[in-house]
């Protein structure tokens, strides 16, 4: 049985009796129209370079068939189509609102024959074993209802010799930077994002889930436990984001 982690129990609305999965899907449906704008604004655009660096970890594999888990509005899938030029990318997400926004972007860029965005759950990925050459997850593993189960499913659908690349928020280690980060993520970001999206709880949840997530070596240990090899963690931008890799 998959182990439970403290972050698995972090939810957008603690007063709700709904499951984390259902709450997260509803939350992203609600903020979907402003999601891309807030991503660029709150990160000052640096999230684009983070995605590019993460995808560079897949370049040596020259993947032909890719899966993007928690694809959201398709930012990683679209960038991967241009940067890695695979034959096909499947993006899955539990939020139909985010997928609708992603499909509009994919069609606008003429990538509809390369990228397919569809409803899908990380914990029950609807593909056979050993299907994909590479799997990506950007800012999504924190939202898994059961982290270990989701990572195990990714391992299952990845081909032998394939690679998982995860991009996820982490906490800086330098004391002065950590205090500034906590102030920004705990107070400033929820206030600003709440005013723009009319959903302050979504960005309070963002901070709470970052604080609870088993980052760094702890997440590498999860990858190792589920069978991945050659695992690694590379912090970016003073440690506020990290790239994790694991091979099957």
Regions picked out by a protein language model, each given a short descriptive name:
Residues 1-26:
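N-terminal auxiliary segments of SAM/dcSAM-dependent transferases
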Residues 34-37, 44-65, 79:
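Conserved alpha-helix/loop element of class I SAM-dependent methyltransferases that forms part
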Residues 35, 135-136:
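Hydrophobic beta-strand segment of the Class I
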Residues 65-124:
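Class I SAM-dependent methyltransferase SAM/SAH-binding core
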Residues 123-134:
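A short acidic, Gly/Pro-enriched loop at the edge of an enzyme's catalytic core
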Residues 148-163:
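A short glycine-rich, Lys/Arg-flanked "PGG" loop and its adjoining helix->strand segment in the class I
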Residues 167-222, 226, 232:
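C-terminal alpha-helical "lid/dimerization" subdomain adjacent to the S-adenosyl-L-methionine
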Residues 222-248:
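C-terminal lobe and adjacent flexible extensions of AdoMet/dcAdoMet transferase-like proteins
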């Amino acid at each position: 049985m998959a182990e439970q982690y403290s972050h698995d129990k972090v939810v957008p609305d603690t007063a709700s009796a709904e499951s984390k999965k259902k709450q997260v899907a509803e939350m992203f449906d609600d903020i979907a129209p402003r999601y891309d704008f807030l991503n660029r604004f709150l990160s000052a655009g640096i999230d684009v370079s983070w995605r590019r660096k993460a995808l560079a970890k897949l370049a040596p594999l020259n993947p032909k068939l890719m899966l993007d888990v928690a694809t959201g509005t398709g930012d990683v899938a679209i960038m991967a189509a241009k940067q890695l030029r695979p034959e096909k990318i499947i993006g899955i997400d539990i939020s139909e609102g985010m997928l609708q926004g992603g499909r509009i972007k994919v069609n606008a860029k003429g990538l509809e024959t390369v990228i397919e965005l569809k409803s899908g759950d990380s914990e029950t990925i609807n593909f056979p074993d050993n299907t994909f050459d590479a799997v990506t997850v950007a800012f999504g593993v924190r939202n898994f209802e059961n982290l270990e189960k989701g990572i195990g499913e990714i391992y299952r659908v990845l081909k032998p010799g394939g690679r998982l690349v995860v991009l996820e928020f982490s906490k800086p280690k330098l004391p002065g930077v950590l205090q500034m980060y906590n102030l920004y993520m705990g107070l400033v970001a929820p206030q600003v994002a709440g005013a723009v999206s009319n959903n302050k709880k979504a960005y309070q949840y963002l901070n709470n889930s970052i604080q609870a997530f088993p980052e760094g070596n702890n997440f590498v240990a999860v990858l190792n436990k589920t069978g991945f090899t050659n695992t690694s963690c590379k912090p970016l931008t003073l440690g506020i984001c990290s790239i994790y890799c694991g091979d099957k």
